[in-house]
C-alpha cells in the first residue's frame, strides 16, 4: 500500500480507491485510510515529536513487527543467526546506507 518514492496519487485497496493528499491516505469521502510517510519518518516523529526514547522507536519499527509476524528469530534484531538486514542512520536520523542479508544494497 506504500506510495513512498512514487508520484502516484491513488491506488486500489479491497475494491476502494485510496487517495494521497496532504500527508495522508484517504478514501473518496475523506475517511482516513493511512499515513503517507516512510518508516524513518515514523521513527523520527515518535522520537523527536512525541519524546519516545530512540531505542524504543527503533524497536517499534523492527523487533515488534517481527514478533507480531512470528519471524523475530531471524528478523528485527541483531543476533547470531539472525538475517543481517540493517539500516545505518546518521546522527540526524537520515538513512546513510542499507544492508540486506549483510550485503550493502544502497548507500547515500
Question: In which residue ranges do the predicted regions lie?
Answer:
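His/Asp/Glu-enriched, well-ordered alpha-helical/loop segment
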Residues: 2-89
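Mg2+-dependent phosphoryl-transfer enzymes with acidic/Ser/Thr/Gly-rich catalytic loops
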Residues: 106-107
Amino acid at each position: 500500500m506504500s506510495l513512498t518514492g512514487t508520484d502516484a496519487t491513488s491506488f486500489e485497496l479491497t475494491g476502494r480507491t485510496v487517495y494521497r493528499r496532504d500527508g495522508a491516505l484517504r478514501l473518496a469521502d475523506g475517511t482516513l485510510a493511512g499515513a503517507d510517510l516512510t518508516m524513518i519518518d515514523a521513527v523520527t516523529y515518535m522520537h523527536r515529536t512525541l519524546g519516545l526514547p530512540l531505542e524504543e522507536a527503533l524497536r517499534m519499527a523492527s523487533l515488534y513487527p517481527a514478533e507480531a509476524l512470528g519471524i523475530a528469530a531471524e528478523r528485527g534484531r541483531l543476533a547470531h543467526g539472525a538475517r543481517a538486514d540493517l539500516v545505518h542512520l546518521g546522527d540526524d536520523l537520515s538513512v546513510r546506507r542499507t544492508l540486506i542479508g549483510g550485503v550493502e544494497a544502497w548507500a547515500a
